[in-house]
Amino acid sequence: MPIKIDSNLPAHKLLENENIFVMTEERAVSQDIRPLKILILNLMPTKIETETQILRLLSNSPIQVEAELLQTATHEVKNVSKEHMLKFYKTFDDIKNERFDGMVVTGTPVENMEFEQVDYWDELCRIFEWSKTNVYSSFFICWGAQAALYYKYGLKKYQLDKKMFGVFEHVSLDTFHPLMRGLDDKFWVPHSRHTEVRRGDIALIKDLQILSYSEKSGVHLISDMECRNFFSTGHSEYDRDTLAKEYFRDVEKGLDIDLPENYFTDNDPSKTPEVKWRSAANIIFSNWLNYFVYQRTPYDLSTL
């Protein structure tokens, strides 16, 4: 998917170096089509790394995408320059009168806190409520998924005895669902979290369907019955070295952290990790964009 982003965004050069088609404004306006407008609410502290990961996945089909980066105004960003945030990110007040074909909400490492304790929780709730009328389809990732499930359905998260950390095998529970089309019988997904949502709780909510599951890491993909909201408990967007960075960071801090499972070659952290989740990640995001955004969203977004 040709993706239209600011040519000065760090992700632009990184993606071009990977031979990913990044479209300039000049090229985009010369094409007589309406691009999909996708809003990315980036809650992660690693802003540049995460925005690049999400943009990479959004670029993998022939439809033109125009991505907009969103931050929460009620949280002070410390891991990236203010210049970067001012130049490339908007706040809710900037976009609240706009409409979007799709929205991606990332995770963030605040899961050990109660939702209401997160400093931008009220703002996030306003964005969730706004998205009901201003966004056609949304894709929520990890803590973003837990937060949305809690806001929309009152679904609780539970503390795990040990961090769910590694790359785990999953199966589809509905192979005929369009989001699952093209996936292998078993596919791999990275997870990195201290909390979980439970299958039994989800089963009590008639508006939700579990699409994929892992015997080790539990519920993975969830959809509402309208197929306008999708929730992922994993991190399909992760790079080869993302879990390694998290592991070595925690080791440096002296934290009690196990090796990520099914990740390092020969379970040896000195060896390069083997990527086995990328094809599934591309399929899931391409299916979401194609079947649930491109094929369903109105041409005139004002009619949402």
Stretch-by-stretch model annotation:
Residues 73-86:
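N-terminal beta-loop-helix "entrance" segment that forms/cooperates
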Residues 105-174:
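Cysteine-nucleophile active-site neighborhood
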Residues 1-74, 89-95, 99, 126, ...:
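Amide-donor transfer/coupling interface in amidating biosynthetic enzymes
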